[in-house]
Amino acid sequence: MKRPPDFNRVAQIYAPMEKLTFGPWLWRCRCCFIQELKTQRIGLVLGDGDGRFTAKLLEENPLVLVDAVDASVEMLNKLRLNAGLRSARVRVHLADARAWVPEGSAYDLIATHFFLDCLATAEVAELARKIRARTSADAVWVVSEFTIPDNWFGWLVAGPLVRALYLAFFVLTGLRVQRLPKYREAMAEAGWARIKEQRLLAGLLVGELWRAQ
């Protein structure tokens, strides 16, 4: 297993960098289905960066308890800060999600926002199987990702942009993955079914809601 990228280097500038490059769009993508996550009680959030989504989830769902997993101590510190007093409902785990063993057995909410694109397809498949074994029968998984549409926009704009982003994060964090994984196929094979989808920025961004089968 390759060493995880070092996001400690960008923790302090993560949110400003995001707003500078994509404005509000990544945030809107993360929150596509936030209103449908109000009945879940035990959540697992992987690689949430500075934790703004986790903070929003805690605000919208006053009963949910969250396990937050990240390989960056600085990102976890930002998550606690953004969650404020609600951080009492969060257990943070400083770990590589690929190797971390879930402690619960009845997660009914999984969230990965712009995280699966840091993994290879085989790693997504293994992670999805591992998580499915630790979720409830009615669990949902909310996903936000970059995509490359199979059209002129994908060929001329989205594709080059995604490649540039991978190069930038290789320089900034040491991220070794350099292409988007086939996460949909991997999740489907692991027992997850996509039930909703919302595309933004001409298909460059996609928010998805999946349910355990």
Residue ranges and their predicted role:
Residues 44-45, 49-99:
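Class I SAM-dependent methyltransferase SAM/SAH-binding core
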Residues 111:
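A conserved beta-strand element that flanks and buttresses the S-adenosyl-L-methionine
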Residues 114-117:
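Short catalytic micro-motifs in class I SAM-dependent methyltransferases
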Residues 125-137:
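A short glycine-rich, Lys/Arg-flanked "PGG" loop and its adjoining helix->strand segment in the class I
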Residues 144-190, 197:
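C-terminal alpha-helical "lid/dimerization" subdomain adjacent to the S-adenosyl-L-methionine
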